[in-house]
UniProtKB/Swiss-Prot annotation:
Gene Ontology terms: biological process: apoptotic process; proteolysis
Domain PDZ: 296-381, 882-963
Organism for this UniProt entry: Coccidioides immitis (strain RS) (Valley fever fungus)
Xref: Gene3D superfamilies: 2.30.42.10, 2.40.10.120
EC number: 3.4.21.-
Keyword DNA repair among record annotations: no
Protein name: Pro-apoptotic serine protease NMA111
Family of this protein: Belongs to the peptidase S1C family.
Length: 1034
């Protein structure tokens, strides 16, 4: 089960007693099974290990394979029992389509078994049924498949019930398994019958070793409590969550729930008393009542109870009435403001409930569940003294969230009893279960509690909704919040409310009749207030001996870019850096393209750390890693200064002044010198192509500050800027799966023609040679057939660097294009339009030429060819289709740079967690070539074909991987949670893009939400590891 990552430090430190071993939830998909025990938090004893749920995806299953003991041959009786049992066991494949409560959106698989063949009820784990929106299907033993919907998930205990249509199973008689909780006894031989990651049936044997184990704590996230667990040696493997634990009679005596993930052959099963009661209630058409006094109890052995004050008289009485008992129930957590608050205390030993001597959870549950809305009378011992208390029994369902609201890209609901219990806090407040969009707080996915919005308290979800209804689009408001792991620290942030990319405030309400979550739009966005001009002054640099450095502060602005969807393989949803003002009168700013990668985004510029104005993309350079953006200068009443750019190329060894901004966005200054100017190409990213700079001369300087600063300039003594200092997005490392950023200088002369055109009101429409080159020295050139005459000409033309350029890669043409690429890999370029090419800057002639006459050396022979340049506007993305959670677009420029053949113009750029694309394995970097056997060479033909596919229906996609491997993926369409939508670039639209929503295949234009779309929950890389969307959490 893919959840929040490796377990964090547990809230409470338990003793090493087996009653209370701490647990961790699961292994990450990218982690291997531990070879030695892994200890949670600050525990260092080597005898404790973590525990894992047994529903995982195939990657998890591969990581969690364990060495099993030698298998014994089952008796004939056992074989007959298993043959009967397996007919009722199903493999469940499911998604939680949206983050909710303790779990992020995810796709996984597990096991269940039929408990009512007539009505179509399947029993499985609660963490399979999911607290949030569920979408899934099950596969029977004969490989028949049918949809399943949740009809019950317990608020606390780890079981839930799914429903299927019995009429959908046509080729096998349906049989059900009988639940017999009373047959679970120590020494009973059992079999765990489940699926091994959905691939095949696994049958594991074991023997029950104890019945009175406390429910394991799985760290952060969902954990069962207020029940005992059954322990056995079975070594269940990945995918067996929800498996029936059967005895030799074929009766189910427990439910597989969790186990140790360190290789120890120990598993933990949920007793079936409460699942059996819930099933009987549902079969009778009754509500499953669940009561609580918001108190967690745990089993403690008698020796610990004596230390807590259990009197000898009561111990003797308990041992007399229940001679087999070895412990009693003790209050572990009493939640503030709950029914037990002020009446019970941690450490109270429970003696009686409603006059009945009580030592087991099952009777306590019985009493509470039958007393909802009434009172329960408890007798406890506290420090050796008897104490009688009366508590109101609360409805447990009432404090379990069954709705959430999505607004400004983030998801919220009332704090759940699960989270409140884990952190021993009052069960109230607004909980952020998907911190994204406007509410992306401190790079954490979830866990925030919102105390106030816009200086107004938000004590519950209803108050939160009412406050958000009054906040206009693009408003900046004060947000007060705390993280559930650190409630002592209150955070305050200014958030920018996005109601234009995400205009709808949408309420999702669980519907237990249909098994779906119903969506309601709560309020239309309030239009943004017109911006007003504001005044500000820039900071003064103290102690700087260089006047030019002090003055350049007025030419820098801070740029923040937020992207509503991941395009072009870009790994982040938000970036921040500093830009250089190159025309203060027109509001033109140059910024790294690693900060503003494309124009489907929100850009905000902060001037003088005071004035915030929006900006738009004017120009994206296809090769040299810079973007030109523009803001409205009439809104800025500050002494912004136009930076002066040098028309001369800076030389190696030249002294210069480095002015940059470090990671804290503080300006730093150092006198330095240029150490090297070399032609570079940023390494390509193997996992997923994304924009990178190629064919440019990069400048490096002799100061350690250069590696710490992502933005800045190289400045002459006269205040003229000689080079921009930019960050360049590079490859993702194989080991850490983190993106590499390079910090290099870019000389200013190449910028000046582009800026001049923009200043004159003309957007540059550059044409480029669609190739990547690299430098070769004369020794290599001579071997490859360059004549001595040309070698001499090179030496005269470029005395500083004797080099020529060889074609490393020719960009791939569109499959719909008839263009022929005259250049080939390995060609050495001598001249273009009769000009010898020995510097990267000399390629700039291509920008305004449709064709170039080239003299090249190919296979040792000189030849003349005509090269047609490519218009760069064709290389930028102008359309993105969201289908079944996948982002589809034309192959962007970086794809064409890295691939040798484009298989279609339908390219998978990213996909969302918990979506059909994720569940069925449609991976980023795949090309889709056909739908149901009909070729779809472009997005229009793809839309036509998929629009004809009914909802909840399987269809076939023919795809080709980035490595040219064709394959077929079968997917099921889900329009309820993942309707088809589209972004289309339209300069006349207010945002520069318009949105198209498809309702049952019919186009509806507007600016509506792209439903269930969250850039922070998107994965843009192939399945080789974790992306920046889900960074490693240590």
């Amino acid at each position: 089960m893919e959840l929040n990552g490796s377990p964090q430090k547990p809230k409470r430190k338990h003793s090493g007693d087996p009653h209370s071993l701490p647990s961790a939830k699961h292994l990450r998909p990218d982690s291997a099974a531990p070879s030695s025990p892994r200890i949670s938090g600050d525990q260092t004893s080597g005898d404790l290990a973590v525990y894992g749920y047994r529903n995982v995806d195939s990657a998890d299953a591969a990581a969690m394979q364990m060495k099993l003991p030698a298998v014994q041959t089952d008796s004939a009786e056992w074989q007959e029992t298993i043959e009967t049992v397996v007919k009722s066991v199903v493999s469940i494949h499911f998604c939680q389509t949206a983050s909710f409560d303790t779990d992020l959106s995810m796709s996984s698989q597990a096991t269940g078994f039929v408990v009512d063949a007539k009505r179509g009820y399947i029993l499985t784990n609660r963490h399979v049924v999911c607290a949030g929106p569920f979408w899934g299907y099950c596969i029977f033993d004969n490989h028949e498949e049918c949809d399943v919907t949740p009809i019950y998930r317990d608020p606390v205990h780890d079981f839930g019930i799914l429903k299927f249509d019995p009429k959908a199973i046509k080729y096998m008689p349906l049989t059900e398994l009988k639940l017999q909780p009373e047959s679970a006894r120590v020494g009973v031989e059992i079999r765990v019958v489940g699926n091994d990651a959905g691939e095949k049936l696994s049958i594991l044997s074991g023997v029950i070793s104890r019945l009175d184990r406390n429910a394991p704590e799985y760290g952060e996230g969902y954990s069962d409590f207020n029940t005992n667990y059954i322990q056995a040696a079975a070594a269940a493997s990945g995918g067996s969550s929800g498996s029936p634990v059967v005895n030799i009679d074929g009766h189910v005596i427990a439910l597989q729930a969790g186990g140790r993930a360190d290789g120890a052959a120990t598993d933990y099963f949920l007793p079936l008393d409460r699942p059996l009661r819930a099933l009987q209630c549902i079969q009778k058409g009754e509500l499953v009542s669940r009561g609580t006094i918001q108190t967690q109890w745990i089993i403690k052995p008698f020796d610990e109870c004596r230390r807590l004050g259990l009197s000898p008289e009561w111990e003797a009485e308990v041992r007399r009435v229940a001679p087999k008992e070895t412990g009693m129930l003790v209050a572990e957590i009493v939640l503030p403001e709950g029914p037990g608050d002020g009446k019970l205390q941690e450490g109270d030993v429970l003696i009686k409930a409603n006059g009945e001597l009580l030592t087991q959870f099952v009777r306590l549950d019985d009493i509470l569940d039958s007393s909802v809305g009434g009172d329960v009378h408890l007798l406890v011992q506290r420090g050796g003294e008897d104490l009688e208390v009366t508590c109101k029994v609360q409805d447990l369902h009432a404090i379990t969230p069954s709705r959430y609201v999505t607004v400004a890209g983030a998801t919220f609901h009332d704090l759940s009893y699960q989270q409140a219990r884990l952190y021993a806090i009052a069960c109230k407040g607004v909980y952020v279960c998907e911190a994204a969009g406007s509410f992306k707080l401190e790079s954490t996915f979830s866990g925030w509690i919102i105390d106030s919005v816009d200086k107004r308290p938000t004590r519950n979800l209803d108050e939160f909704i009412e406050v958000l209804k009054t906040i206009p689009d693009r408003a900046r408001i004060v947000l007060s919040y705390r993280h559930i792991r650190d409630l002592h620290t209150r955070g305050t942030s200014i958030v920018h409310i996005d109601r234009h990319w995400h205009p709808h405030m949408r309420l999702a309400q669980r519907n237990d009749q249909t098994g779906l979550w119903d969506f309601t739009d709560l309020a239309d966005p309030i239009p943004a207030e017109p911006p007003v001009p504001r005044k500000a002054d820039f900071i003064q640099l103290d102690g700087v001996s260089h006047p030019a450095a002090a003055d350049i502060v007025r030419s820098f602005v801070r740029v923040s870019c937020t992207m509503p969807v991941k395009l072009d393989g870009f790994p982040q949803a938000r970036k921040t850096g500093f830009g250089l003002v190159v025309d203060a009168e027109k509001g033109l700013v140059v910024i790294s393209r690693a900060i503003v990668p494309f124009d489907l985004c929100d850009i905000n510029i902060t001037v003088a750390d005071s004035i915030i104005v929006s900006a738009k993309v004017v120009f994206l350079h296809p090769l040299q890693n810079y973007t030109i953006i523009q803001y409205d200068p009439s809104l800025v009443q500050a002494p912004v200064k136009t930076a002066r750019l040098s028309p001369e190329y800076i030389k190696q060894g030249a002294e210069t002044l480095f002015v940059g901004f470090n990671q804290n966005f503080r300006i730093v200054v150092a006198k330095t010198a240029v150490t090297d100017i070399t032609t570079v190409a940023i390494p390509p990213n193997a996992a997923a192509p994304r924009y990178r700079a190629i064919n440019l001369d990069a400048i490096t300087v002799d100061t350690g500050l250069s590696s710490q600063c992502t933005s800045g300039v190289l400045l002459g003594e006269d205040g003229v800027i000689q080079a921009l200092w930019l960050n360049y997005l590079g490859e993702r490392t194989q080991s850490s799966h983190k993106d590499v950023e390079y910090h290099l200088g870019l000389a200013t002369p190449s910028l000046i023609p582009v800026i001049s055109q923009i200043q004159s009101g003309v957007i540059p429409r550059l044409r480029i040679l669609d190739m990547e080159t690299y430098v070769i020295q004369m020794s290599q050139a001579r071997v490859m057939g360059v004549s001595e005459e040309w070698i001499e000409k090179v030496a005269k033309a470029n005395a500083a660097r004797h080099e020529l350029f060889m074609v490393r890669k020719v960009d791939c043409a569109s499959p719909l294009s008839a263009d022929v690429r005259p250049l080939e890999e390995g060609d050495i370029i001598l001249t273009l339009n009769d000009k010898l090419i020995t510097r990267v800057s000399e390629f700039d002639m291509m920008y305004d030429q449709e064709t170039l006459d080239a003299l090249i050396v190919r296979n040792g022979e000189e030849m003349k060819i005509k090269i047609k340049t490519v218009p760069t506007e064709d290389l930028e993305t102008d359309r993105a289709l969201i289908f079944c959670g996948a982002v589809l677009q034309k192959p962007h420029h970086a794809v064409r740079q890295q691939i040798s053949k484009l298989h279609s113009e339908v390219y998978v750029s990213a996909r969302s967690r918990g979506s059909p694309a994720y569940q069925y394995g449609l991976s980023p970097t795949n090309f889709i070539t056909a739908v149901n056997g009909v070729k779809t060479p472009d997005l229009d033909s793809f839309i036509r074909e998929v629009s004809n596919i009914p909802n909840n229906t399987y269809f076939r996609l023919r795809a080709v991987t980035f490595d040219n491997v064709p394959w077929v993926v079968t997917m099921k369409k889900n329009d309820h949670y993942f309707p088809m939508s589209e972004y289309i670039k339209e300069p006349s639209a207010p945002l520069g893009w318009r949105t198209v929503n498809y309702d049952r295949g019919k186009e509806r234009r507007g600016t509506g939400d792209i439903a269930n779309l969250n850039a922070d929950a998107m994965d843009e890389g192939r399945d080789e590891g974790v992306s920046d969307v889900e960074p490693d959490i240590e």
